[in-house]
Regions:
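Structured domain cores in non-transmembrane regions
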Residues: 33, 41-168
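A short, hydrophobic C-terminal helix/tail in secreted or cell-surface proteins
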Residues: 261-281
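Sec/Tat signal peptide C-region and signal peptidase I cleavage site
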Residues: 24-31
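Low-complexity, Pro/Thr/Ser/Gly/Ala-rich linker/spacer regions in secreted
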Residues: 30, 254-264
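Short, charged juxtamembrane terminal tails flanking transmembrane helices
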Residues: 284-288
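Extracellular low-complexity, O-glycosylation-prone Ser/Thr/Pro/Gly-rich "stalks"
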Residues: 165-257
Length: 288
């Protein structure tokens, strides 16, 4: 991987994120302000995470099903191959007119490095946004990702509107293979390992399965002193199939549950490009 390859991918990804950083489709009602935090728990020399897509919905938005092709789930393929959340953002907005979603950006250029965390605050309606879903690409890879396939897996509010919250860890055994690209792990076709453009991998035409892990001698042994700001980039700690390997932690906390007006149906887009953020990003680097 070289600086140009990494930089080009980061610029393209950041542009896509700016187009769909926050989308809200809530009606005037009682709102709760939530803080959503994702932390990359990978060890030193571990893998990176692309900016995570998160969504609050009524429990009907299905991101994927194991054993099924992503062709049947609009928007997720571009995320699992290239970390691009824009198509998923559009699909969610179309399917969930009362849903609330965001893409969690890091303090600096994407992606989220090992030991780094970032937070967003969002206003949601407990009556229509009881459940939480997430998705992020694990990189470098061809189409490895983490996401919840069960839309009812994370209940944030009960039927009475009481806040339940969430605090959970995604293990390496939960990393999935999108089945859309062959896992050749070649630089030209592997995101953040030298790929110059999106959607350049070899089509696999497969289904979503548990990821078999990265290949020893390719990604797991990659060291390139010119890759990341002139610093060595070593993925020898990126074997997420190792027992007990932790990939990410998600936390959802209640910041405020005061009754207030939520925007009438509409879309708030491009907050990053406009210079305003509803996010309170925090970054913590893992100490060596």
């Amino acid at each position: 991987m070289n600086k140009f390859a990494l930089g080009s991918h980061r610029v393209a990804l950041a542009a896509a994120m700016a187009l769909g950083t926050v989308t809200t489709m809530a009606t005037a009602a009682s709102a709760a302000t939530l803080r959503v935090t994702i932390e990359n728990l990978a060890p030193i020399n571990g893998g990176f995470l692309t900016p995570a897509w998160v969504g609050f919905h009524d429990g009907t938005f299905d991101l994927y099903d194991r054993g099924e092709s992503l062709d049947d789930f609009t928007g997720l393929e571009s995320l699992v191959e290239d970390g691009d959340t824009s198509q998923l953002t559009d699909a969610f907005a179309a399917d969930n007119p009362d849903g609330v979603q965001a893409t969690l950006l890091s303090d600096g250029p994407p992606p989220l490095e090992p030991g780094e965390l970032t937070s967003f605050t969002l206003d949601v309606d407990p009556a229509t946004n009881q459940y939480f879903s997430y998705a992020s690409m694990v990189i470098p890879s061809n189409d490895a990702f983490i996401a919840n396939g069960n839309p009812l897996a994370h209940e944030i509010f009960d039927d009475a509107g009481n806040f339940l919250g969430a605090d959970f860890i995604v293990l390496g055994s939960e990393v999935l293979d999108g089945g859309t690209e062959v896992n050749d792990e070649l630089p030209f076709s592997t995101a953040f390992l030298g790929q110059q453009a999106p959607d350049t991998g070899i089509d696999e035409n497969g289904v979503v399965t548990e990821h078999p892990g990265l290949t020893v001698g390719t990604i797991l042994g990659t060291t390139d002193s010119s890759a990341l700001n002139g610093l060595p980039l070593n993925f020898t700690g990126a074997d997420f199939t190792a027992p007990g390997y932790q990939v990410a932690r998600f936390r959802i906390e209640l910041v405020d549950n005061q009754v207030e007006d939520v925007p009438e149906p509409g879309i708030i887009l491009g907050l990053v490009a406009a210079g305003g953020l509803v996010a309170a990003n925090r970054k913590r680097k893992q100490t060596a």
